[in-house]
Amino acid sequence: MFYISKDNPCYYFTSVTNNRLPVFRTDKLKEITCNAISEARKSSEILIFAYVIMPDHFHIITDGKLKPSNILRYLNGVTARRVIDYLKENNFTSSLDKLKQFEKKRGYKYSLWEHHSDTFTITSESMFMQKVNYIHLNPIRAELVGNMDDYLYSSARIWKRKLLENEPLEMDIGKIKWRET
């Protein structure tokens, strides 16, 4: 079980695409991102409590077993590899051109993510729920849906116990041991 406390924090991450490009406009790329997050989750053994994938960024809350920099490295590294591989395999050259970054030693490489991702340490259940609600309201604020349950690439349904048969990403909310009532 996971207790949220100062000694055992969670982390709230926001990763933004390079130049805020709307890379995740299509369901296919959101699905690839969910699969990549799931892969990172398993390989790094992190717990994921909430998420949303927006057109140009994602928010996610994880446990604090690893250092935040390592969690972010796993999440952003695996998602970048999977998304860029998909774009290459399907000849999305104009999208790849927008993600090119020049490196002196190696020439061009691709950079999916901005290099200043936002990390926030969560040390209380009330702060945790504030971030969960913020994440779930994101698609409404962006006018992508009218009801948070209608946005497929979010954990909102899971938190409301309205799971779909094939949720895009598994959550670990059952592993939270709540202290406050």
Regions found by a protein language model. Give the residues of each.
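Short catalytic/metal-binding and nucleic-acid-binding patches
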Residues: 1-181
